[in-house]
């Protein structure tokens, strides 16, 4: 049963991205989602014109579109978006570099897990925003402090998911490696990582999502650029249209990366490392 599920997932992953999106585009779910989105925009416009909220607190969709145009023409949208994307990329990259190896060690070694897992579980519940004051003291206001908050918030999902992947690996693979006296590096590279790959990718998805959420709060406090700063600056100027434009930009980038970049990475890594051999 598990092999059938694996084969189905590999078949889906092997499809070209455009083909998968073409199938989604004509699906019933897509049509329902589009209708719901249009209805939401119409309701939004109606509420904005009803007078329930003052104009300086509730922007109309047309005003948000105009905010997109004006901030783009001034270069503010591109500058702040690029600043946030840079911080997000560096923070997620560092979280992956630290989280994957530590997760492998925690999953593969009982002694290492007994020594360090309690500390990880103790620190993990601390919200990333709570680290901003210390990050400012350590790194000052700007790039480094924001990246630190993204890193510290995002390292845990990939770490715990990698550990779960290693601990749930079928014992027969470990037994075969031990019988043939496989070198430790070979065992990690050819057994642990491929076997844990679906968990690692899931952890990276969660890390990206968590980082993209926390970056807004971090930039509001510890940065003078970025989408979070742009949203907070618009608040002081009573510009809800710019605030919503920044929020939509964040949502669009997150959607594109989640549904295009990660799908592409998953397809390549599964074929190269993960389940291709199992499916055969």
What is each residue range found by the language model?
Residues 148, 152, 184-218, 241, ...:
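Transmembrane alpha-helices
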Residues 90-120:
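Transmembrane-helix boundary motif in ABC transporter permease subunits
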Residues 121-157, 164-165:
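Generic hydrophobic transmembrane alpha-helix motif, especially the helices
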Residues 59-69, 73, 212, 222-235:
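Short hydrophobic, aromatic-rich alpha-helical segments embedded in or entering the lipid bilayer
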Residues 118, 158-203, 227:
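Short cytoplasmic-facing helical segments at TM-TM junctions of multi-pass membrane proteins
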Residues 14-27, 49-94:
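Periplasmic/extracellular loop-to-transmembrane helix junction in inner-membrane transport proteins
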Residues 1-36, 262-280:
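Transmembrane alpha-helical segments of polytopic membrane transport and secretion proteins
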Residues 227-264:
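Hydrophobic alpha-helical transmembrane segments of polytopic membrane proteins
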């Amino acid at each position: 049963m598990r092999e059938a599920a694996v084969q189905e997932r590999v078949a889906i992953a092997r499809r070209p991205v455009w083909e998968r999106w073409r199938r989604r585009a004509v699906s019933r779910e897509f049509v329902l989602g589009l209708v719901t989105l249009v209805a939401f925009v119409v309701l939004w416009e109606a509420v904005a014109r009803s007078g329930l909220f003052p104009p300086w607190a509730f922007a109309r969709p047309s005003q948000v579109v105009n905010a997109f145009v004006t901030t783009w023409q001034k270069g503010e949208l591109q500058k702040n978006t690029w600043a946030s994307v840079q911080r997000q990329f560096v923070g997620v990259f560092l979280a992956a570099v630290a989280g994957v190896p530590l997760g492998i060690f925690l999953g593969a070694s009982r002694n290492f897990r007994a020594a360090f897992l309690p500390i990880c579980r103790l620190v993990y519940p601390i919200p990333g925003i709570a680290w901003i004051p210390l990050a400012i003291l350590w790194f000052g206001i700007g790039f480094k402090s924001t990246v630190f908050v993204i890193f510290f918030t995002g390292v845990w999902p990939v770490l715990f998911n990698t550990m779960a992947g290693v601990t749930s690996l079928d014992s027969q693979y470990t037994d075969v490696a031990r019988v043939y006296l496989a070198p430790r590096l070979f065992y990690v590279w050819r057994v642990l990582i491929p076997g844990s790959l679906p968990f690692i990718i899931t952890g990276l998805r969660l890390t990206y999502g968590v980082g993209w959420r926390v970056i807004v709060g971090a930039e509001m406090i510890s940065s003078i650029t970025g989408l979070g700063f742009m949203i907070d600056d618009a608040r002081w100027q009573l510009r809800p249209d710019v605030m919503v434009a920044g929020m939509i930009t964040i949502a669009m980038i997150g959607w594109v990366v989640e549904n295009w970049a990660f799908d592409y990475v998953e397809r390549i890594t599964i074929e190269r490392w993960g389940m291709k051999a199992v499916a055969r």
